[in-house]
Swiss-Prot record:
Name of the protein: Plasminogen
One term under GO cellular component: extracellular space
Keyword Phosphoprotein listed: yes
Transmembrane spans: none
Reactions accelerated catalytically: Preferential cleavage: Lys-|-Xaa > Arg-|-Xaa, higher selectivity than trypsin. Converts fibrin into soluble products
Active site: H618 (charge relay system), D661 (charge relay system), S756 (charge relay system)
Signal peptide span: 1-19
Miscellaneous comment: Plasmin is inactivated by alpha-2-antiplasmin immediately after dissociation from the clot. In the presence of the inhibitor, the activation involves only cleavage after Arg-576, resulting in 2 chains held together by 2 disulfide bonds. Without the inhibitor, the activation also involves removal of the activation peptide.
Disulfide bonds: C49-C73, C53-C61, C103-C181, C124-C164, C152-C176, C185-C262, C188-C316, C206-C245, C234-C257, C275-C352, C296-C335, C324-C347, C371-C448, C392-C431, C420-C443, C476-C555, C497-C538, C526-C550, C563-C681, C573-C581, C603-C619, C695-C762, C725-C741, C752-C780
Assembly information from the UniProt record: Interacts with CSPG4 and AMOT. Interacts (via the Kringle domains) with HRG; the interaction tethers PLG to the cell surface and enhances its activation. Interacts (via Kringle 4 domain) with ADA; the interaction stimulates PLG activation when in complex with DPP4. Angiostatin: Interacts with ATP5F1A; the interaction inhibits most of the angiogenic effects of angiostatin.
Gene Ontology BP terms: blood coagulation; fibrinolysis; proteolysis; tissue remodeling
C-alpha cells in the first residue's frame, strides 16, 4: 500500500477544479448555508464565483452562493451535508458534487466523503496527527489528496480503495468500507443508478428519453426532474426490478438493461417503521392480511399468483415472509393474496402518530384563482403550485428538500399536504418545490382586493380582481411580469423604489438601462429584467434593504370563459366513480350527457367548442342518423335535468380515422357558454401524459350499488404507462399506442359502463385538458384491469380538420 515510489505520486493529483465546469456542481435556487468559514467577493456571474472557489487556498472550497441582484459571491468551506440549509431570496447555491458523494467510483481515488471508521469499526487517525502512527501521507505533502480531518482517503491510488491510519497503536492502517457509486454498478433495484450504459440486455441501443420515436411514452424528462432521465441511459424511474429503457427497435418497445450489481453493500436505508408514514415504503411491520381479510402470499412464492416482486428483484425492500410491503411506490403497502381470484390488495397499516396516510401525495392547484389577505399567514386554501408552475413538496416530506418547516415544528400554521402556506411571515404564501434544483418559490396566488373581505379558508374560494380605481387597467402583469411596463414604483412594504440609473443608496452595475435596454428600466418603476419568477422588483431607497418585490396584480383575462377553467372549483376526491364521490355541481362544465332522441342517457361526452362534442365512436353504433341523438349540457342530475340545462340536437356525426374509438358530434346550434357550460381544452398534437399523472373521470355511470345513480360523479385516477398496462397480468398487450391507461392496479374501481365516451381530464399549468375519451376495459372496477382511453393528442389534426371543414 504505502511502499510504492511516492516520488511520482504527485502525477496522480491534478489541481482540483482544473478543467472543471459548473456541471461538477449541484445547483439549488433559493438555498443558503449557515457557514462559519467563508469569503465574500463582488462577482457578476456564477462563472466568476466558480473561478474564485477553485483558486481558494486558505480552505477547501466546497460550495459557493451567487446573489444576482447584489452582484455578490460567497465561497464556503462547508456544504449541505455539514451545514444547515435556509431558504433565501435571490440566491443560487452551488455545491461541488465530489464533496456531496458518500460513495466511491473505481478505486475511490477521488472519494471526498466523511466516513471516518475502518471496516472493522476502528476510528481513523487524523491525517495531520503524528500519534499513534507517524504518517507517510500528510496534508502538507499531498495538499490535493483531500487529507482532511480523519476521513477515509486513497492518496496512493490503492487498488483496494480508501483507507486510513487507525487510532489503534497495534494496527497502523486499515481499509474503509465505502460503498460504490451507482455509475458503474447498481445497488438494490437500481433506482439511483446514474451510469451511462445505454444498451439493453439483448444489445439493442436505447431510445433517448426526450424522444418519442420510435416509441411514444410518458417518461418526459422535464416532468421527472429527480429521475435523471438523461440521453438514452438506462434508468429505473418507476420501481421496476432493475434499470431499463425504451429501445431504438420499432418492434421492441422496451427491455431491461444488464447493469452489474455493486460488490459493496448498499448505503444504509432510512429508519424502518412499524407503522404507516407517507406511502409506507419504509414499513417493516409484520401485518400479513389485506384490508378485506385475505391472507398474503409469500413474496418468494409464485402460487397462486406469478409475479416479479421477489426478494431477489427487490433486495432492499424488506420482502420477508408474507408481510405487507410497498416495493414499487404504490399508494400504500400491499401484498399478493392467497385467494386465486384476488391478485393483490392494500393492507390496513396503522398510521404513525398523528400523521395521515399519503401526506406526500402531490395535490394539484385549484383552477379558480384563490387569494390571500395581508401576508397570507392565515391563508388556508388548497393551491399547491408555485408562481412558475412547479408542484409543491409536502410539508411532512424531506424529499427532494430537507427542511425544518414541518407540521410538528409549526403546529398552528396548518401545514397540510403540499398546500401553499406562510409559516414564517414572508411576504406571501410559499412552498418547497418538487424540483431538486429549486428549493422554494412563492405560490401562484393573488392578494385579495377590496376592503372588509374575509380570510380565505379551505371551503371558500374567491376570484381576485384588479382595483382599477387606484391603478389604471394596464397596471397589471401577465405571468411573472417580465413584460410589465406599468408605473408602480413602491415595494410590497411601501418603500419607494430607487431609480434604475441611480447609484445611491445602492451601487449596482448589472441592471441598468444600458445593460438591459429592452427591459423597460425607466425612472424608478418596478420591473423584472432578470425574469425572476417571483415577479417585478426594484432596488429600494432604504439603505438597509438592497431590493424588494412589488405588489403587481395579475391582469384579468379578456375572455369571460376560458377553456378548461370552471367557475366552480372541483372538489378533491380520493375515490373512483365506483363508490366514488359526487361532483360539485357545474365543476366539470364540459361534461355532456349523450341521449337518444327519447331522452335516455347512454353515453358521456366532452364539449370542446361551442358547437362540437367529442365522444366514443362505439356510442354511435345504434344509429348512423344524427337525428337519433341529442345532448344535454350544464346538467348535474341525470334525470329531471335542471331548468338552466341546454338540450341541443345533433346535426352531423364524424367517426375517427382507422376505426379509432373516437367521434365528433356537430350540434344543431352553438351552446351558450356560461358559468355552467364551458369547453375543455385540447392537448397539443402527440402530447404524452407523464406516467402517474393524476387525472379525473366523470359521469353518471354504474356505481355497482355503492351509491345511488342520478348525480354526476367524479374519480381521480393515475395514468399508467402503456409498457406497464400491457403486461400479461394486466391487459396483456391489448393497449395500442393511440390509447392510454388509467386506474389503480391494486383493484379498486374506475369508470364503468355508462361513462363511455366521457372525458379523462388532466390538470396542466392552470387549466384542465382533455387527454382521453373513455373507451373500454375488461369489466368494471376489476382488480388489475385499468380503464383504457383513446389518446386525444393523437387525433388533434383530425379534430381540427373536421371542425374547420364542416
Amino acid at each position: 500500500m504505502e511502499y510504492g515510489k511516492v516520488i511520482f505520486l504527485f502525477l496522480l493529483f491534478l489541481k482540483s477544479g482544473q478543467g472543471e465546469s459548473l456541471e461538477n456542481y449541484i445547483k439549488t435556487e433559493g438555498a443558503s448555508l449557515s457557514n462559519s468559514q467563508k469569503k465574500q467577493f463582488v462577482a457578476s456571474s456564477t462563472e466568476e464565483c466558480e473561478a474564485l472557489c477553485e483558486k481558494e487556498t486558505e480552505f477547501v472550497c466546497r460550495s459557493f452562493e451567487h446573489y444576482n441582484k447584489e452582484q455578490k459571491c460567497v465561497i464556503m468551506s462547508e456544504n449541505s451535508k455539514t451545514s444547515s440549509v435556509e431558504r433565501k431570496r435571490d440566491v443560487v447555491l452551488f455545491e461541488k458534487r465530489i464533496y456531496l458523494s458518500d460513495c466511491k467510483s473505481g478505486n475511490g481515488r477521488n472519494y471526498r466523503g466523511t466516513l471516518s471508521k475502518t471496516k472493522s469499526g476502528i476510528t481513523c487517525q487524523k491525517w495531520s496527527d503524528l500519534s499513534p502512527h507517524v504518517p507517510n501521507y500528510a496534508p502538507s505533502k499531498y495538499p490535493d489528496a483531500g487529507l482532511e480531518k480523519n476521513y477515509c482517503r486513497n492518496p496512493d491510488d490503492d487498488v483496494k480503495g480508501p483507507w486510513c491510519y487507525t487510532t489503534n497503536p497495534d494496527i497502523r492502517y486499515e481499509y474503509c468500507d465505502v460503498p460504490e457509486c451507482e455509475d458503474e454498478c447498481m445497488h438494490c433495484s437500481g433506482e439511483n443508478y446514474r451510469g451511462t450504459i445505454s444498451k439493453t440486455e439483448s444489445g439493442i441501443e436505447c431510445q433517448p428519453w426526450d424522444s418519442q420515436e420510435p416509441h411514444s411514452h410518458e417518461y418526459i424528462p422535464s416532468k421527472f426532474p429527480s429521475k435523471d432521465l438523461k440521453e438514452n441511459y438506462c434508468r429505473n424511474p418507476d420501481g421496476e426490478p432493475r434499470p431499463w429503457c425504451f429501445t431504438s427497435n420499432p418492434e421492441k418497445r422496451w427491455e431491461f438493461c444488464n447493469i452489474p450489481r455493486c460488490s459493496s453493500p448498499p448505503p444504509p436505508p432510512g429508519p424502518m417503521l412499524q407503522c404507516l408514514k407517507g406511502r409506507g415504503e419504509n414499513y417493516r411491520g409484520k401485518i400479513a392480511v389485506t384490508k378485506s381479510g385475505h391472507t398474503c402470499q409469500r413474496w418468494n412464492k409464485q402460487t397462486p399468483h406469478k409475479h416479479n416482486r421477489t426478494p431477489e428483484n427487490f433486495p432492499c425492500r424488506g420482502l420477508d415472509e408474507n408481510y405487507c410491503r410497498n416495493p414499487d411506490g404504490e399508494l400504500e403497502p400491499w401484498c399478493y393474496t392467497t385467494n386465486p381470484d384476488v391478485r393483490q390488495e392494500y393492507c390496513a397499516i396503522p398510521s404513525c402518530g398523528t400523521s395521515s396516510p399519503h401526506t406526500d401525495r402531490v395535490e394539484q392547484s385549484p383552477v379558480i384563482q384563490e387569494c390571500y389577505e395581508g401576508k397570507g399567514e392565515n391563508y388556508r386554501g388548497t393551491t399547491s403550485t408555485t408562481i412558475s408552475g412547479k408542484k409543491c413538496q409536502a410539508w411532512s416530506s424531506m424529499t427532494p428538500h430537507q427542511h425544518k418547516k414541518t407540521p410538528d415544528n409549526f403546529p398552528n400554521a396548518d401545514l397540510i399536504r403540499n398546500y401553499c402556506r406562510n409559516p414564517d411571515g414572508d411576504k406571501s404564501p410559499w412552498c418547497y418545490t418538487m424540483d431538486p434544483t429549486v428549493r422554494w418559490e412563492f405560490c401562484n396566488l393573488e392578494k385579495c382586493s377590496g376592503t372588509g373581505s374575509t380570510v380565505l379558508n379551505a371551503q371558500t374560494t374567491r376570484v381576485p380582481s384588479v382595483d382599477t380605481t387606484s391603478h389604471p387597467e394596464s397596471d397589471c402583469m401577465y405571468g411573472s411580469g417580465k413584460d410589465y411596463r406599468g408605473k408602480r414604483s413602491t415595494t410590497v412594504t411601501g418603500t419607494l423604489c430607487q431609480a434604475w440609473t441611480a447609484q445611491e443608496p445602492h451601487r449596482h452595475t448589472i441592471f441598468t438601462p444600458d445593460t438591459y435596454p429592452r427591459a423597460g428600466l425607466e425612472e424608478n418603476y418596478c420591473r423584472n429584467p432578470d425574469g425572476d419568477p417571483n415577479g417585478p422588483w426594484c432596488y429600494t431607497t432604504n439603505p438597509k434593504k438592497l431590493f424588494d418585490y412589488c405588489d403587481i396584480p395579475q391582469c384579468v383575462s379578456p375572455s369571460s370563459f376560458d377553456c378548461g377553467k370552471p367557475r366552480v372549483e372541483p372538489q378533491k376526491c380520493p375515490g373512483r366513480i365506483v363508490g366514488g364521490c359526487y361532483a360539485q355541481p357545474h365543476s366539470w362544465p364540459w361534461q355532456i350527457s349523450l341521449r337518444t332522441r327519447f331522452g335516455e342517457h347512454f353515453c358521456g361526452g366532452t364539449l370542446i367548442a361551442p358547437q362540437w362534442v367529442l365522444t366514443a365512436a362505439h356510442c354511435l353504433e345504434r344509429s348512423q342518423w344524427p337525428g337519433a341523438y341529442k345532448v344535454i349540457l350544464g346538467l348535474h342530475r341525470e334525470v329531471n335535468p335542471e331548468s338552466y340545462s341546454q338540450e341541443i340536437g345533433v346535426s352531423r356525426l364524424f367517426k375517427g380515422p382507422l376505426a379509432a374509438d373516437i367521434a365528433l358530434l356537430k350540434l344543431n346550434r352553438p351552446a351558450a357558454i356560461n358559468d355552467k357550460v364551458i369547453p375543455a381544452c385540447l392537448p397539443s398534437q402527440d402530447f404524452m401524459v407523464p406516467d402517474r399523472t393524476l387525472c379525473h373521470v366523470t359521469g353518471w355511470g354504474d356505481t355497482q350499488g355503492t351509491s345511488p345513480r342520478g348525480l354526476l360523479k367524479q374519480a381521480s385516477l393515475p395514468v399508467i404507462d402503456n409498457r406497464v398496462c400491457n403486461r400479461h397480468e394486466y391487459l396483456n398487450g391489448r393497449v395500442k399506442s393511440t390509447e392510454l391507461c388509467a386506474g389503480h392496479l391494486v383493484g379498486r374501481g374506475d369508470s364503468c359502463q355508462g361513462d363511455s365516451g366521457g372525458p379523462l381530464i388532466c390538470f396542466e399549468d392552470d387549466k384542465y385538458v382533455l387527454q382521453g375519451v373513455t373507451s373500454w376495459g375488461l369489466g368494471c372496477a376489476r382488480p388489475n384491469k385499468p380503464g383504457v382511453y383513446v389518446r386525444v393528442s393523437r387525433y388533434i389534426s383530425w379534430i381540427e380538420d373536421v371542425m374547420k371543414n364542416n
